[in-house]
Amino acid sequence: EQYLTTQDTASAHLHVSESDTEFVVSGSNFEYIFDRNTGNFTDIVVDGQELLSAPCDKTIWRAPTDNDRNIKNEWLRAHYDMISERTYETGCIIKDGCAVISCTSSLSAPTVQPVLRINAEWIITPEGTIKSKMHVKKNAEFPTLPRFGVRMILREDMRNVNYIGMGPYES
């Protein structure tokens, strides 16, 4: 694969490569690959270990519970269970010593107008921290979302994992 541009930051050990299909951001102990076609990370490697067992993706679906019985059929009519992401534009710049990947995309079901329009930024620090900022606009013609999130399917052997689902505070 031929890379179009390569850029090192003034900060220690942050390297960014760009091709037609991906951005590769690497530092002293990490390498992250962002797929420009899907708008998601495909590889997150830290200390030589791949953390993902599948590429990341954005999702709104979850299995309905008994409490969802009144809205479940609306979710199914809206085809929320068949949602996929369409990526329109991606970019990567160096800002304040960090790599900033931007992505404009939408989530929609086949033959249905977009449910969500997403402007996402992924900020990667020279130490390997990934921060996300997303502006998500829901189409008012669709029912309430079951959920919205980024799915990261981790390796099965990972046992000690922390995450923040709805922010850093109790929810």
Over which residues does each language-model region extend?
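Beta-strand/loop-rich accessory regions of lumenal/periplasmic or secreted enzymes
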Residues: 2-171
